[in-house]
């Protein structure tokens, strides 16, 4: 799958400078910000994967409407993600395979100043797991982070027993840096996380090999 010229992508907008929707491409996947009309597809995938995903995610608030069942809540979620993109705090994308919604990949917690870093988070439909789609999506947004957003470092934090997610890092050859104890509260438990790091220097050194394997 070929990509449009990446220099036209505006890092803080849902559209490019030419007015076209923001889309990023790998060999087999496309990623773009979710919009209100994605509700049915997003809701179906989230419901079908409830058990698969819940053990790796924070507990949902009982006091807020569930965006997987409430269209207005989903629309508000999209608006909030757009606002975060506009302010440069995070960049959220839906993953699409042959036009069908399959998961999400996000650049979260963007810090500028001396750090110039962000954290990548992701999830995928269990029916699509094991086919390297997520490795491709992580590389697509890493390229965007380094080349369009000008970030210096990306970090990915994974619960040690989440072997599927750690396999994503292994396929891309992203460095394991160590263990952060009781790092995030996941499903009601303060979980240790393995921290992985990927810097722009590593991206430049491995650009040709990674692009040929995953992007071109």
Summary of predicted features, one role per range:
Residues 122-124, 130-147, 163-171:
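Conserved acetyl-CoA-binding loop-helix of GNAT-fold acetyltransferases
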Residues 36, 160-162:
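A short coil/beta-turn micro-motif at the C-terminal edge
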Residues 157, 175-192:
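Conserved catalytic-core motifs of GNAT/GCN5-like acyltransferases
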Residues 147-157:
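Conserved GNAT acetyl-CoA-binding A-motif
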């Amino acid at each position: 799958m070929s990509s449009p010229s990446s220099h036209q992508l505006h890092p803080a907008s849902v559209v490019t400078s030419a007015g076209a929707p923001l889309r990023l491409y790998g060999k087999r996947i496309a990623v773009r910000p979710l919009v209100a009309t994605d509700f049915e597809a997003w809701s179906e995938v989230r419901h079908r994967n409830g058990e698969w995903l819940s053990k790796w995610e924070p507990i949902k608030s009982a006091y807020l409407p569930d965006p997987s069942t409430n269209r207005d809540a989903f629309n508000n979620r999209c608006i909030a993600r757009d606002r975060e993109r506009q302010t440069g705090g995070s960049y959220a994308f839906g993953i699409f395979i042959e036009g069908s919604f399959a998961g999400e990949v996000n650049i979260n917690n963007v810090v500028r100043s001396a750090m110039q870093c962000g954290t990548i988070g992701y999830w995928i439909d269990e029916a699509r797991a094991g086919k390297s789609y997520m490795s491709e999506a992580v590389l697509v947004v890493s390229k965007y982070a380094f080349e369009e957003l000008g970030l210096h470092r990306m970090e990915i934090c994974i619960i040690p027993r989440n072997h599927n997610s750690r396999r994503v890092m292994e396929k891309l050859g992203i460095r394991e840096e160590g263990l952060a104890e009781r790092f995030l509260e996941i499903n009601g438990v303060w979980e240790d996380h393995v921290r992985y790091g990927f810097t722009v220097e590593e991206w430049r050194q491995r650009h040709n090999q990674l692009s040929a394997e995953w992007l071109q």
